[in-house]
Every structure is written in C-alpha cells, then in structure tokens.
C-alpha cells in the first residue's frame, strides 16, 4: 500500500464514519490485504475507485465493516455504568418525573453488550415504578455485521 493509497482510505473512512485511522497503518493494511485478494481487486487504488463510485453504498458498508473494531463485553467500563446508575439516572428521574419518558441512544453498540447492559440497569433502576416509565433504547453502530448479530440477541 502506497502512502497516497493509505491517506485516501483513511480520509474516506474518517469522512464517512468518523473513525480516525491515521496512526493505524498496520491495522488498515492487515485487514484489507486479504480482503482485496479474496475479492480480486488489482490494487488499493482500483478498490477505492470502485468504493467511491458505488452509488448503492454497499462497498462503503463493506469497507467500514472490515475496518471497524468491535471490542465489547457486558459491563465494559464498569465505572461508566456505575456513574450512569448512581448519578445520571437519578438526575433524569427527577428531571422527567412528570413525563416519565426516557430515550437513550447508544452509539458504537457493536454486538449489543453495552446496550443490553444499559437496558438491564434501566430495568433494575425503574423496577419499583411498576412499569410507569416509558423507556426506549436505540442501539446503533457503523458496522452492519455486528448490528445483525446484536439484533438476534444471542
């Protein structure tokens, strides 16, 4: 991979998904080398030409799925979840006590462990309310592969 090809890929990924890979040349090369061979692209330039010309977005989706890192597990960053349960939720409960309406967006959800953890914490926190609160949790990720896995709930 030439320096120009690397910069082109890094800039494209950052513009489409906000993923900063400028210091991760070995990751980009490692993940794309086999992908290009398997899919019979003659070069990174050939591949990126096709990605950028693809109006369906399928090739962009494939590129993002290939380059995204899906590191996740239940109660990951326990301190964050403790803060959410012990500080954030009580503040929300007080501020929204009339509406009893809670909407949470969990970005970078990966295979679902973080949003499922949030759902369990929310259910536990509001359990004494007898279902009076309308809670919704939206889980998103740029990797469609991991979202499909998360939606299965396995």
Indicate residue ranges for each PLM-predicted region.
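Conserved AdoMet
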Residues: 2-105
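Class I S-adenosyl-L-methionine-dependent methyltransferase module
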Residues: 97-154
């Amino acid at each position: 991979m030439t320096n120009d090809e690397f910069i082109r890929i890094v800039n494209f990924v950052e513009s489409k998904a906000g993923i900063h890979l400028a210091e991760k040349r070995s990751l980009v090369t490692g993940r794309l080398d086999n992908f290009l061979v398997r899919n019979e692209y003659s070069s990174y330039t050939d591949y990126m030409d096709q990605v950028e010309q693809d109006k369906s977005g399928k090739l962009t989706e494939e590129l993002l799925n290939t380059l995204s890192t899906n590191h996740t597990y239940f109660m990951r960053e326990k301190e964050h979840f403790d803060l959410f349960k012990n500080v954030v939720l009580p503040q929300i409960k007080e501020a929204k006590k009339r509406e009893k309406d809670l909407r949470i967006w969990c970005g970078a959800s990966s295979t679902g462990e973080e949003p499922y953890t949030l759902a369990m914490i929310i259910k536990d926190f509001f359990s004494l309310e007898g279902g009076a609160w309308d809670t919704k949790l939206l889980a998103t990720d740029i990797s469609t592969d991991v979202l499909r896995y998360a939606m299965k709930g396995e």
